[in-house]
């Protein structure tokens, strides 16, 4: 199975990617991991990517595409893969399609974990973390026993900067702008499968599994 995973921040993509990877024995490939590995190993592509990142610039599409294509040639991808964080643009999606076609392969499905903005806001802005021991909480779904204090070390729990309402709204807006053209691209090719991400983790995974196994 060759799949890509789409979804807004806070949709639970990481959790589902782990479950899919384990059940179907395919690698979960994230662009962040690819960048980090190539940079730490000082590969030619990694050195180029680091030059852009050190300047605070976005890594160009062409370089990102080369890095992903290189990763997809590895032995563990022969039976399939799950791409997370790529493609982000229609240009990248077209490049992925071209790469797969040239290797006599095709994408089986583009999974979209769909979650309304109001749900994401509640899920992400409610997150709290202990700055001392790292324990995680949620003011609605998993609150500490004593309000505002960590169960483990009794320190005051905090909201990370990434989880403030303003930051979350901005991330959702960026995601919507970037992803809608991709949704249209895969929908036009009948490769898009939309999953209701407001369900429980188990329900979302069951829906995805049924779709994957129906596609085999």
From Swiss-Prot:
Major site of localization recorded for this protein: cytoplasm
Q: Do you know which CDD domains this protein is assigned to? A: ADK
Q: In which pathway does it act?
A: Purine metabolism; AMP biosynthesis via salvage pathway; AMP from ADP: step 1/1
Q: Where is this region: LID?
A: 126-163
Q: Give an example GO molecular function.
A: adenylate kinase activity
Name the chain's protein.
Adenylate kinase
What are its E.C. numbers?
2.7.4.3
Q: Where is this chain's protein located in or outside the cell?
A: Cytoplasm
Annotated residues that bind ATP are located at 10-15, 127, 136-137, 199
């Amino acid at each position: 199975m060759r799949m890509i995973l789409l979804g807004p921040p806070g949709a639970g993509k990481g959790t589902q990617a782990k479950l899919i990877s384990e059940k179907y024995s395919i690698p979960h490939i994230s662009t962040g991991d690819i960048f980090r590995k190539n940079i730490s190993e000082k590969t030619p592509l990694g050195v180029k990517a680091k030059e852009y990142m050190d300047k605070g610039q976005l890594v160009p599409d062409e370089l990102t595409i080369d890095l992903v294509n290189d990763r997809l040639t590895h032995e563990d991808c022969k039976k399939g893969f799950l791409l997370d964080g790529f493609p982000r643009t229609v240009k990248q999606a077209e490049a992925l399609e071209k790469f797969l076609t040239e290797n006599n392969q095709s994408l089986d499905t583009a999974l979209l974990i769909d979650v309304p903005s109001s749900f994401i806001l509640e899920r992400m802005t409610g997150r709290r973390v202990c700055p001392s021991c790292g324990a995680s909480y949620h003011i609605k779904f998993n609150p500490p026993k004593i309000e505002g204090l960590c169960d483990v070390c009794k320190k005051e729990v905090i909201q990370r900067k990434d989880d403030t309402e303003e930051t979350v709204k901005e991330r959702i807006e960026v995601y919507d702008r970037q992803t809608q053209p991709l949704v249209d691209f895969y929908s036009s090719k009948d490769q898009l499968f939309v999953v209701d991400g407001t369900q429980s983790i188990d329900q979302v995974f069951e829906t995805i599994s049924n779709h994957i196994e129906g596609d085999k």
